[in-house]
Amino acid sequence: MKKNLLLTLTLCLLAQWSVAQAPKWVEKAKRAVFSVVTYDESDKILNTGNGFFVTEDGMALSDYSLFKGAQRAVVINSEGEQMPVEVIMGANDMYDVVKFRVAISGKKVPALVVSPTAPTVGTSVYLLPYSTQKDRSYTAGQVKEESKVEGQYHYYTLDMHLKDKMVSCPVMTADGQVFGLAQKSSGKDTATICYAVGADYAMSQKISPLSFNDHALSSIGIKKALPDTEEQALVYLYMASSQQ
């Protein structure tokens, strides 16, 4: 009995120490993390997961798997407020990322700054979970390996245990910038290893004139954004109309 009590007290003290040691930016940064709920064509819940804002006007990142087959989606912020996903801005099914814009309810939302540089191997990193509580909880780990995606973007192996409900939560540098989206590992190393696709790669996803035939995008029933330039947008609209 005494041993169990001692163990409980020790765990509580460790948890309190972890929160006390949390970087000062954690509580504020967690406000940019949200829950995502997607719905199918019958308006029944399809999937639930996580995502986070990367601009104050509502641009956000999450995992593609969450949106595949969805006809609509909403995000629920740390205050419990629901906001609809307005348009899909890009997606990649191989690396399981999606970029989208949320129809925000106010003038701006809390957003994370995407790190311009990749953290080096051995660097301490922090995963921020979605929470409606104002706390500074996080999961700490280290960068185990770093590799390239398409020659210029990044993919990471992390020394970090990832729970199911933490997929697509932001992984942060020590100075509070997001560099990756958390992804699950498979096999025998799931207890100690997880992965993160670079936030830089997720941000690079976009709609091009040829995106109308993109299988990953067409598998999402939510409205797509137009390409960035007027010329590309006209080509995209022409391609779309010719397929109808």
Enumerate the predicted regions with their spans.
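Terminal peptide-recognition signature
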Residues: 34-36, 51, 58, 62, ...
